[in-house]
């Protein structure tokens, strides 16, 4: 279906929401995230364990250094031109962001759903840490050459108050760079600052989950590509397999159309009662 048709459906949905903001968009929708939350009953064990009750902090591409955080985010631990490759400044102000959780001024070239975790598998661009081979579960099946990260771009699921968001690992932090016992094991975060912060979340992740103020403890775990459900984290980025592969792009559009149709039908049913 054409982009014009999708835009008409979106406009119809917006009008419906303005008329009745309490509408449930997708009741029992199969497209909702299926990644297991730590409090849900499971029919199978997830491939990676949950890290529970972890303090989250926030960061963004292009963030300037501060007294508490002297490192700028124009570059990441794995991308010396992160801001340029992203396409610009990932403005964290919610007023300057769109409904699909991206910065309003441009379409990002990389996935706006990103996180940082406190482990770097590289010493530099020519050498991989010795510990990486020992502690990273997927190392043997993804390693290509010395100095090339096997962590960069890895998918993560974040759970907050019953809602799950997916994002890609894009940088190292907060505060630590070698906390493998926490990132890949069962230990608590080594960092003492910010209430033992153990994960950095991008503005897109923050806004999707609705994290505000000091109520910022979440759960997270690694996820395989095959586990990643439909969601806004599939839409953007040349580093995103769902956005860069035609079959995933097509499937994402079809899912979006189906969700909009279901929302319209749900509203019509409610209106006829």
Task: Map each language-model feature to its residues.
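Bacterial N-terminal signal peptides
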Residues: 12-21
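Sec/Tat signal peptide C-region and signal peptidase I cleavage site
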Residues: 23-27
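Bacterial N-terminal signal peptides that target proteins for export
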Residues: 4-12
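Secreted/periplasmic proteins
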Residues: 28-273
């Amino acid at each position: 279906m054409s982009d014009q048709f999708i835009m008409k459906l979106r406009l119809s949905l917006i009008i419906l929401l303005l008329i009745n903001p309490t509408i449930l968009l997708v009741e029992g929708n199969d497209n909702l995230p299926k990644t297991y939350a730590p409090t849900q009953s499971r029919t199978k064990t997830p491939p990676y364990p949950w890290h529970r009750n972890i303090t989250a902090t926030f960061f963004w591409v292009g963030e300037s250094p501060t007294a508490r955080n002297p490192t700028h985010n124009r570059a990441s631990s794995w991308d010396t031109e992160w801001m340029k490759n992203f396409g610009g400044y990932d403005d964290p102000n919610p007023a300057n962001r769109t409904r699909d959780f991206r910065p309003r001024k441009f379409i990002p070239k990389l996935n706006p759903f990103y996180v940082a975790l406190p482990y770097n598998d590289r010493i530099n661009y020519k050498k991989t840490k010795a510990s990486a081979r020992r502690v990273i579960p997927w190392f043997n099946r993804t390693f290509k050459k010395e100095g090339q990260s096997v962590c960069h771009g890895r998918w993560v699921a974040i759970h907050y108050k019953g809602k799950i968001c997916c994002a890609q690992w894009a940088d190292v932090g907060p505060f630590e760079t070698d906390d493998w016992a926490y990132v890949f094991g069962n230990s608590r975060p080594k960092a003492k600052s910010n209430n033992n912060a153990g994960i950095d979340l991008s503005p897109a992740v923050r806004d999707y989950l609705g994290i505000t103020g000091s109520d910022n403890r979440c759960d997270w775990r690694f996820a395989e590509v095959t586990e990643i459900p439909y969601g806004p984290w599939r839409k953007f980025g040349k580093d995103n397999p769902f956005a860069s592969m035609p079959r995933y792009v097509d499937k994402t559009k079809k899912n979006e159309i189906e969700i909009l149709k279901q929302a319209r039908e749900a509203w019509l049913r409610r209106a006829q009662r």
